[in-house]
Amino acid sequence: MIYTLDQHRVKTVGDNFYIAPNATVLGQVELGEDVSVWFGAVIRGDVEKIIIGKGSNIQDLSVLHVDPGSPIIIGENVTVGHKVMLHGCTIGDNSLIGINSVILNNVEIGNNCLIGANTLLTEGTKIPDNSLVMGSVSYTHLRAHETDRH
């Protein structure tokens, strides 16, 4: 379903696109030719723009959202896998974002990249063209003192 938010209407390039009946697209969103948005996906351009390039697809249950000053720009022929969370990032042409990945504000992913399933890219990460990225790095932020343990 396409919704208008305030004065912002969703823009489409041509008539050749698909939005599943229970997908939600609203606000400052531009869909290129041959874009598809699948079941349960939410594309919410409420405070900044979201541009999805020609031939790209947003798979089931993915969420695209923005912050002021952090738009989402998705290049051409990009696949955003099932249950992906994109927030204020840029994705280059011919890239694939794997199932259940989380891409945070101001991340820049180059052209021809593969982001593996369940990958977390933290704010401001830059991924060069032709890269394969998988997993998420965690580290200890705080350790309890011996006397604090039960």
Residue ranges and their predicted role:
Residues D15, A20-P21, L26-G27, G32-E33, ...:
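Left-handed beta-helix
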Residues G69, S138:
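Residues that form or immediately flank small-molecule/cofactor binding pockets and catalytic motifs
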Residues T140-H150:
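Conserved small/polar residues in nucleotide/adenosyl-binding loops
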Residues M1-D15:
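Extreme N-terminal tail/first-helix region
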Residues R9-K11, V137, A144:
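Proline-rich low-complexity regions
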Residues L5, I19-A20, T140:
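Intrinsically disordered, low-complexity regions enriched in small/polar residues
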